[in-house]
Design a protein with these regions (language model features):
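Long, positively charged amphipathic alpha-helical accessory segments at protein N-termini or as interdomain linkers
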Residues: 6-160
Length: 160
C-alpha cells in the first residue's frame, strides 16, 4: 500500500527500494510524490482519480516549505519506528512493533477490493481484512483468506 489517499482519491505515492551497500549493509531509498496543484486528467484503468493539496486546503504551503515539513516528519517517524523495530522479538514479523499504527492509516480495511497483478490482471476480489506483521495484504475471498506481498498485488476499491 503505497498510495497516499485523501477523500478516496490519490494525493500522492511513496516508493521504497531496499538495497545493500558495497559492504553488504542494508539501506533504503525512499521517494515521495505529492500532488500540490492537480489538473484533472484521465484516470488510468484500475487506478484512482487524483486530488491535489489545493483541493483539500485553500492555503497550500510553498513547495520548498512543504518539502522541509514532509522531510522532517518522515525522518522523525522512521527514527521512532527504527527504535521500536530494533527492540522487537526475533520471531515477530518486521511490522510487529508498528503494526497497529500502520493498520490505523490504511485505506479500504473492511471494504471490498480487487487485487491486481503488476501487469494489471485480476488476481482476486474480496474484503480487505488487514496487512499481517510480515507486510502481506490479507483478503477474505469466497474461497478463504488469500495473502499477497506488496510486489505481487495492487489493491483497488470495488464499486459497491
Amino acid at each position: 500500500p503505497n498510495d497516499l489517499v485523501a477523500r478516496g482519491r490519490k494525493l500522492g505515492g511513496i516508493l521504497v527500494e531496499a538495497a545493500r551497500d558495497n559492504e553488504g549493509k542494508p539501506f533504503a531509498v525512499c521517494g515521495i510524490g505529492v500532488n500540490v496543484n492537480y489538473t484533472p486528467q484521465e484516470v488510468p484503468d484500475g487506478g484512482l482519480a487524483a486530488i491535489g493539496l489545493s483541493d483539500l486546503n485553500e492555503s497550500v504551503p510553498a513547495v520548498d516549505m512543504l518539502l522541509d515539513e514532509v522531510y522532517h516528519a518522515v525522518i522523525d517517524a522512521v527514527d521512532a519506528w527504527a527504535k521500536r523495530l530494533n527492540a522487537k522479538e526475533e520471531d515477530a514479523g518486521p511490522l510487529a512493533p508498528v503494526h497497529d499504527e500502520y493498520i490505523a492509516h490504511l485505506n479500504w480495511i473492511g471494504k471490498h477490493v480487487i487485487a491486481r497483478s503488476p501487469a494489471g490482471g485480476e488476481l482476486t476480489r474480496g474484503v480487505f481484512k488487514t496487512v499481517d506483521a510480515f507486510g502481506r495484504a490479507c483478503i477474505e475471498t469466497e474461497d478463504g483468506l488469500r495473502s499477497f506481498h506488496f510486489e505481487e498485488a495492487s489493491l483497488r476499491p470495488l464499486s459497491e
